[in-house]
Amino acid sequence: MENKSLIGQVTQEQINSWKAKYGSVFYTTADNRIAYFRKPNRKELSYAMRLQDDPLAMIEMVLKSCCIGGDDTFIKEAEYLMGASALVEKLISVKKTEVGEL
């Protein structure tokens, strides 16, 4: 991430605090704005999976639930929300596992 000041940008100290609390911290930027996100918890994932038939609602739910700071434009305005939709894939990452029969 560049060192120029963005709308919603927080200090490294705040980011470190979030990392201590949430583990991973993700961000998205557009039009000189930045927002920060954490991974969803199990309850949020469960609810998101129920919204799979409505992708826009699922994206909105995940981003609104997981936004921890920065510029709230990304969760309030549709074009920013859709632009940040690629972030949902990172937030809901799945570990590849091996399955076998014994």
Residue ranges and their predicted role:
Residues M1-K19:
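Short, basic/low-complexity N-terminal boundary segments at the transition from targeting/disordered tails
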